[in-house]
Amino acid sequence: MPRSVPSVASRERRKKILKLAKGYFGRRKNVWTVAKNAVERGKVFAYIGRKQKKRHFRGLWIQRINAGTRQHGLSYSQFIGALDKANIKLNRKVLADLAMNDPEAFKAVVEKVKK
């Protein structure tokens, strides 16, 4: 037998959606049917955004690595190919962080790859 609670389930569902719609403009924030559609659409965009975030960050890391390697006379593709041949297992996130925040260490990696 389901648990008995004093509140009505449908009211709780509506309150949950209206709480998620807080901050929306116009009728989207307080009219149930409009808010429901707006929240549903917002959740779709949030899902898509979580996937796109991974792509965008990878692109950003590649740009940073490319900028760092060009200062040392290599292109990004040459650098990544040479990294693979030298059997250095650093991912793009770490390489981008080195290029931005620790140029000396990044230079050491580039020099190791150039040999």
UniProtKB/Swiss-Prot annotation:
GO cellular component terms, A-Z: ribonucleoprotein complex; ribosome
InterPro entries xrefs: Ribosomal_bL20, RIBOSOMAL_L20_CS, Ribosomal_protein_bL20_C
Keyword field: Ribonucleoprotein, Ribosomal protein, RNA-binding, rRNA-binding
GO biological process: ribosomal large subunit assembly; translation
CDD domains: Ribosomal_L20
SUPFAM superfamilies linked: Ribosomal protein L20
Superkingdom, natural source: Bacteria
GO MF terms, alphabetically ordered: rRNA binding; structural constituent of ribosome
Record-stated family: Belongs to the bacterial ribosomal protein bL20 family.
Record's function text: Binds directly to 23S ribosomal RNA and is necessary for the in vitro assembly process of the 50S ribosomal subunit. It is not involved in the protein synthesizing functions of that subunit.
Name of the protein in its database record: Large ribosomal subunit protein bL20
Taxonomic source organism: Cytophaga hutchinsonii (strain ATCC 33406 / DSM 1761 / CIP 103989 / NBRC 15051 / NCIMB 9469 / D465)
Protein encoded by which gene: rplT
